Amino acid sequence: MRHGKAGRKLNRTASHRKAMFANMAASLITHEQIVTTLPKAKEIRPIVEKLVTLGKRGDLHARRQAISQIRDAVVVAKLFDAIATRYATRNGGYLRIMKAGFRQGDNAALAVVEFVDRDTSAKGAADKARVAAEEEAAAA
């Protein structure tokens, strides 16, 4: 029986889950929006929300705790400088999960995880080029 067992295994070992969530958290903080499967999205939300709360604390110990979880000092710097100040007055609820249909290959449920008041310019040059190409195709 699995009474009281919280969290999903996602067909991965504990070390693989830990590494995957660290990478997903870093990507989410960097780009402020990611597309993933719905179960992974539901698992990553509390992890990143706790990281944002660490960023709002802002002290050295909180920064070291965030670095130990994400393992990327540049991402942690963005978390503590940009994201934590943006959500200084908000008490939780920093992320939103929106269902995004099903994946073509295996029909897995997809979801978009994004920050509530996200910076739309954080997606990067590759995404801007893709959006511009889509707008050109739609206009033509």
UniProtKB/Swiss-Prot annotation:
Signal peptide: none
Matching Gene3D superfamilies: Ribosomal protein L17
GO biological process, alphabetically ordered: translation
SUPFAM superfamilies: Prokaryotic ribosomal protein L17
A GO cellular component entry from the record: cytosolic large ribosomal subunit
Similarity comment text for this entry: Belongs to the bacterial ribosomal protein bL17 family.
Protein name: Large ribosomal subunit protein bL17
Taxonomic source organism: Rhizobium rhizogenes (strain K84 / ATCC BAA-868) (Agrobacterium radiobacter)
Gene behind this protein: rplQ
